[in-house]
């Protein structure tokens, strides 16, 4: 990560121009060895992360914006992540924050979400948990034995602690590779039936991956997957608008399905 370039880019921002979102790369460290990681070569260089003071300068110059997207590496390895989130809540009045995680630290995640809900009560927090398939499929893809059950433990503990909290959202994120391509539909169906997740996003492996040969997908294959999982996303849409009434119900459902299709096209098909 080029710290000087990142910092200078934010210094150049005009605080008079309101941003919608900021993507913040908080660490290059990771406790997994994902086969499809497109940042592996950069992580191997072990470049230093942005310091808290550097991130503070970003917050102080960004002005108000709505959504903070945390990125890495594995964000839960950043010890001061709670302070970083609270910084942007106080200075920038964020309304939503998204945190991706491999779920290897379930207790830390739950502890941090509790702290965030207490100190940032008006902000939604979305925990985006990586799950790529059943059991050993997930562990093989992530390069960590037992990762699957750790991730499930994380998801279960989030449900137990925040099940009725509408400001704590749970999203499952799956990356399509040669390891899981034959179980995407079954896996998504299983996740939908077992957990009260907000949604389940999928994307194809992209970039210079750690392991050669994980990106075996063609446009026709991705189109077929899109068609196969369409009923699952319809079920997610129905779940989302279950308590919605009037004209808002079909409109919300329509835009949700359109957004999901657009995300799939951008995150997967554009990389073929």
What are these regions (language model features)?
Residues 2-125, 161, 220-228, 232:
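Conserved alpha-helical substructure of the radical SAM core
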Residues 119-269:
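Radical SAM enzyme [4Fe-4S]-AdoMet core and its adjacent flexible, acidic
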């Amino acid at each position: 990560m080029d710290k000087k370039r990142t910092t200078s880019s934010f210094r150049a921002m005009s605080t008079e121009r309101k941003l919608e979102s900021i993507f913040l790369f908080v660490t290059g460290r990771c406790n997994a060895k994902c086969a499809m990681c497109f940042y592996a070569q950069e992580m191997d260089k072990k470049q230093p992360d942005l310091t808290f003071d550097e991130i503070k300068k970003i917050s102080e110059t960004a002005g108000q914006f709505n959504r903070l997207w945390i990125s890495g590496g594995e964000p839960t390895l950043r010890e001061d992540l709670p302070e970083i989130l609270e910084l942007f809540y106080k200075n920038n009045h964020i309304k939503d924050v998204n945190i991706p995680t491999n779920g290897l630290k379930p207790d830390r995640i739950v502890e941090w979400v509790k702290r965030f809900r207490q100190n940032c009560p008006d902000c939604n927090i979305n925990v985006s948990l990586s799950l790529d398939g059943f059991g050993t499929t997930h562990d093989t893809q992530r390069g960590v034995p037992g990762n699957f059950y750790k991730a499930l433990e994380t998801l279960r503990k989030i449900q137990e602690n925040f099940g009725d909290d509408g400001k704590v959202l749970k999203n499952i994120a799956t990356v399509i590779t040669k390891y899981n391509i034959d179980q995407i539909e079954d896996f998504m169906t299983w996740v939908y039936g077992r957990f009260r997740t907000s949604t389940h996003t999928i994307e194809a492996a992209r970039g210079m991956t750690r392991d050669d040969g994980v990106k075996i997908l063609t446009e026709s294959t991705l189109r077929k997957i899109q068609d196969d999982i369409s009923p699952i996303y319809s079920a997610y849409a129905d779940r989302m608008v279950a308590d919605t009434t009037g004209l808002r119900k079909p409109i919300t459902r329509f835009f949700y399905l359109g957004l999901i299709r657009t995300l799939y096209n951008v995150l997967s098909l554009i990389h073929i």
